[in-house]
Amino acid sequence: MTDIVILDGARTAIGTFGGSLAGTTPIELGTVAAKAALERSGVEGAQIGHVVFGHVINTEPRDMYLSRVAAMQAGIPDTTPAMNVNRLCGSGAQAIVSVVQSLMLGDADFGLAGGAECMSRSPYIIQDQRWGAKMGDIRTLDMMLGALNCPFGTGHMGVTAENVAAEHDITRAAQDEFAMTSQTRAAAAIADGRFASQITPVMVKQKRDMVPFDTDEHPKATTLDALGGLRPVFQKDGSVTAGNASGINDGAAAIVMARADAAAKAGLKPRARVLGYAHAGVRPEVMGIGPVPAVENLLAKTGLSITDFDVIESNEAFAAQALAVNKGLGLDSARVNPNGGAIALGHPVGATGAIITIKTLYELERIGGGKGLITMCIGGGQGIAIAIETL
């Protein structure tokens, strides 16, 4: 595999549903992240040869070409092509893979990958409005809930988590303990300032003033007793609750990548290189187990072992599926999501893959680690995995 390197990246803080970023469009979030990534990397906008952004839920017509608008607003010229990718939960990770592929093929020397999502701005649509209804009620559809439902009829993604819990013997107690660990680790990371260098602030309106939003706001102070007292959401006698599931969130991230030879020629020092990537498909009704075959495919392609990774960011769509993935891959829980995951920090669906890649890079450097693994389950029954190594 041609050496593809990561020069630098940045993410916004993650906003909670209806929270600080609810008034900010995904294009603006993507623009903020892209500008910061370019500035940190030392790459000029004119050097970027290809842009790919993950994005799932269009909130306005311009979002249909979010990547193009964000890129140009960030200072990338109109001669540089851009595209959106939608691999649902894996969109931000797929954006990275797509840029890697473009660079490997020699289509560009430098690329920008990222993701942007503002789930708070998800629209309602009226499908019958264009051609009219002859009589009767007209129903509106919530596009956010639509994105969170299985396209094959299983129902909400939470039902797929219940299925995974049943198939892999994941108890309610284990899920709540996992959720508590996520909250505890995230709170410790924020208090210790571990995310500060990753985050670029977003200016948001607060009353009459514009203030910087620069701290993840989704984590909640809780206890095991409080988590244990929550009712199951998706099945009457189920185990998946609002407390052991990921959030509905807003945020963005961007990463500048390059061919190693192009970076060296430009006198730029990369922070990491991409070791490989892989995808997999699984039964849609147990979509949460997707990272297991995806990571297995990655290991087979690269010759790596699961024990080679010092930091593993395994997206916490639900505690049930995250635990099943840990179990299926034999992961060391101490290395998985050391600074908390999506249960605590949130899951801005199209951006999360890029966000957790940045988290992995910064944490590897903080602890002096070498290799990192990023993996995610994907609604509809898929998994994606990326391996990186610090330089």
Where are these regions (language model features)?
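Condensing-enzyme catalytic core mediating Claisen C-C bond formation in acyl metabolism
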Residues: M1-T24, A36, L224-I289, P293, ...
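Conserved active-site "lid/cap" helical segment
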Residues: M1-V56, E60-A70, A74, P81, ...
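N-terminal extracellular/periplasmic Venus flytrap/periplasmic-binding protein-like
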Residues: R11-T12, G23-V32, A174-D261, K265, ...
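Conserved catalytic cysteine-centered active-site region
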Residues: T24, H55-F110, P151-M157, A221-G247, ...
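Active-site pocket-lining segment
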Residues: T160-E162, F195-Q198, K205-Q206, L275-A344
